[in-house]
Design a protein with these regions (language model features):
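C-terminal regulatory/interaction regions
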Residues: 64, 86-121
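Metallo-beta-lactamase
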Residues: 2-79, 84-87
Length: 121
């Protein structure tokens, strides 16, 4: 959803990074949680909860998201799971990197798995 009065985007789980956090992260803005590796936790959440992101070119979707955010004049992002984002210039590149990060090689459709020795597959 989008609140036109506050220019606030509510992306649901689109910017989520699971329930992992350290003491003190709750109640902070994303930019204040300097010990939280946003790229990594976003990548893990996307891989595990939004599995389809591991089998498609996420650049297409992230490009469209960024264009939409610019068209709407988004100033704040309030994800369902995750910290509010108020400094888009600082945080959105980390979000982009997390959403397009390569997933766990065992879970993606990249290279086929190597058969176990003695098993021709």
């Amino acid at each position: 959803g989008f609140d036109t009065g506050a220019n606030c985007l509510f992306p649901g789980d689109g910017f989520a990074y699971s329930h992992y956090h350290l003491d003190g992260h709750c109640g902070l803005l994303a930019e204040e949680a300097t010990s939280l590796d946003l790229k990594d936790v976003l990548a893990v959440f996307a891989e595990r909860a939004l599995f389809w992101t591991t089998t498609t070119d996420m650049n297409i979707y992230v490009d469209k998201l960024e264009a939409l955010m610019e068209d709407l004049g988004v100033e704040v992002v309030a994800p369902t799971h995750g910290l509010p984002i108020t400094n888009l210039a600082v945080t959105m590149p980390k979000v982009r990197d997390g959403l397009i990060a390569d997933g766990d090689p065992e879970m993606t459709l990249g290279e086929p798995p190597v058969p176990a020795e003695g098993n021709a597959g």
